[in-house]
């Protein structure tokens, strides 16, 4: 019986992750994130479209510009939270949480929502980078050096961690305020607030500014990811306890 319950619980978690990665909001966020990354390339994108003869960028060069571009980084918090950050609050408010907890158990419902939110934020960033790479390759008709180096892989990993962090923060803010819009606006406002603090008041604290997370601080990002997931679980427990 315990094994059956465990299997049912794991299926519930997998179901939440699948819903997070296949829902319409994930696809909307994927298109928006890809567009933001493309706009972050700037003048290199113009040269790409004009098919300039002296175009010398490799695929890694272009994707690194996209991943580190200000526009892509400024939109990252809200877009990362878009696919699934408000889902837990929605289920709690509409009463669907009762039947979900009855089927899978409270613990598995909580883990499913936390996993779906975090994984969707991370996968979104990787998928957008992959889609942009395909678009850039297609625009050049295959006439581009397909060089993917270690620097790109590390930068993409950092961006994925940022996506997971902001998605978790969005879920926490939505549950804390009991407002769905806080899932998207909350991470964006927090990001801008930290940017202002870092630039104006604590310039020496480089990693206080989220824009700089993409350039380093791997251990810090892993720690923030862990803390954000734990906070998410705490608020999910509180939310489900009040309504179930």
Segments from the language model and where they lie:
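Aromatic- and glycine-rich beta-strand/loop motifs that create alpha-glucan
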Residues: 1-33
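Secretory targeting signals
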Residues: 26, 34-86, 111-177, 213-223
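Central hydrophobic cores of alpha-helical transmembrane segments
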Residues: 29-35, 180-194, 209-211, 228
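Extracellular/periplasmic helix-loop-helix junctions in multi-pass membrane proteins
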Residues: 198-219
């Amino acid at each position: 019986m315990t094994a059956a319950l465990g299997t049912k619980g794991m299926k519930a978690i997998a179901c939440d992750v699948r819903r997070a990665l296949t829902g319409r909001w994930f696809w909307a966020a994927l298109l928006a994130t890809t567009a933001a990354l493309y706009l972050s390339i700037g003048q290199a994108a113009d040269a790409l479209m004009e098919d300039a003869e002296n175009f010398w960028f490799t695929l890694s060069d272009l994707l690194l510009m996209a991943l580190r571009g200000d526009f892509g980084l400024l939109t990252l918090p809200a877009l990362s939270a878009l696919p699934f950050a408000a889902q837990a609050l929605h289920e709690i408010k509409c009463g669907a949480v009762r039947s979900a907890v009855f089927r899978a158990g409270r613990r598995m419902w909580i883990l499913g929502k936390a996993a779906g939110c975090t994984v969707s934020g991370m996968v979104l960033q990787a998928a957008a980078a992959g889609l942009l790479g395909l678009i850039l390759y297609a625009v050049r008709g295959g006439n581009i050096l397909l060089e993917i180096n270690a620097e790109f892989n590390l930068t993409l990993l950092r961006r994925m961690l940022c996506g997971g962090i902001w998605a978790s923060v969005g879920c926490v803010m939505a549950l804390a305020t009991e407002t769905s819009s806080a899932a998207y606006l909350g991470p964006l406002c927090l990001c801008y607030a930290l940017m202002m603090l870092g630039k104006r008041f604590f310039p020496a604290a480089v990693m206080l500014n989220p824009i700089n997370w993409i350039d380093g601080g791997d251990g810090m990002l892993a720690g923030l990811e862990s803390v954000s997931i734990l906070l998410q679980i705490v608020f999910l427990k509180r939310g489900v306890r009040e309504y179930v």
